[in-house]
Amino acid sequence: MYLTRKSIMLLRKYLLVTESQVSKCGFHIVKKKGDVLYPKRTKYSKGRCSRGCKPDGTKLGFGRYGTKSCRAGRLSYRAIEAARRATIGHSFRRAMSGQFRRNCKIWVRVLADLPITGKPAEVRMGRGKGNPTGWIARVSTGQIPFEMDGVSLANARQAARLAAHKPCSSTKFVQWS
């Protein structure tokens, strides 16, 4: 089967994170400081204000279970990584058999690719924009940031509940039907 460049871009649209695989189209991703994911380099180091984000990724695309955001907001790269680790930690700690460990897969469908800038405390106004301090991902209402497959419904619900406490936005559990 011949794949065009556009179809390859669509296939690599979402960030797929498992224990051994990291891929994202258009970015050079680096794992630094405790496996935190953000772009290695960008064309411009400081971001601009956008006009909003379209609700893309509102349906399950890879797994059978997922978490859906109930309101729009921002997710920091630390919150994304903490939620991913909470999900993986629950899955691997509570596993009763090795079959569960081999079959469990987790997809993170958001990437913190927007830089956040800030100025130091007690600095006067003016003199340009501040230095980049962190990375965020914009999440729209109904977007699915995390998906999982290869687990039972009860374990998936429990893992989604643990992961929901990490980001600052409210989420709900969804199931493919």
Curated annotation (Swiss-Prot):
One of its GO terms (biological process) is translation. Belongs to the universal ribosomal protein uL16 family. Its main location: mitochondrion. This is Large ribosomal subunit protein uL16m. InterPro entries: Ribosomal_uL16, Ribosomal_uL16_bact-type, Ribosomal_uL16_CS, Ribosomal_uL16_dom, Ribosomal_uL16_sf. It is found in: Mitochondrion. Keywords: Mitochondrion, Ribonucleoprotein, Ribosomal protein. GO terms for cellular component: mitochondrion; ribonucleoprotein complex; ribosome. GO terms for molecular function: rRNA binding; structural constituent of ribosome. PROSITE patterns: RIBOSOMAL_L16_1, RIBOSOMAL_L16_2.
